[in-house]
Amino acid sequence: YTLALGCTDMGTGCDTVMAQIAADCLNTPMDNIVVFSVDTDISPYDSGSYASATTYTTGVAVMKACEELKKKICKLGAEMMEVDEGKVDFDGSCVFYDETLEISDGADGNAAGHMTDAEEGYSVDMDAISSEMPRRKFHWKISH
């Protein structure tokens, strides 16, 4: 998974903490989370890293984006297996029902804390302040 962050790690360990949060939410080893730190050309504004504020604000955005990504993965997996979305589950690498569908069978996606975005598929955008999610086509690129 790729985790693109808008927060700046100034020795506070936020890159590591956000990767830990994403790994926990996605039920995957932390080694499967690749962190891309802030890029001022594409990242939204961040007011800075103060005390533990980044963990609470960006951490919540990471959790919400991961939960939304899991829902999207389950929905796509259910469609591919032609079963009801509520009858499938996701274990961090596979969507399963009576049969198992590996992510590599149909998913090309990008999981990110503040914003997920990639070339094809779907994207989950998350505003860390308001938690509003814009309605748009989503993108993902998942690889291990």
Indicate where each model-derived feature is located:
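Cofactor-centric catalytic regions
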Residues: Y1-T2, G6-L26, V38-H144
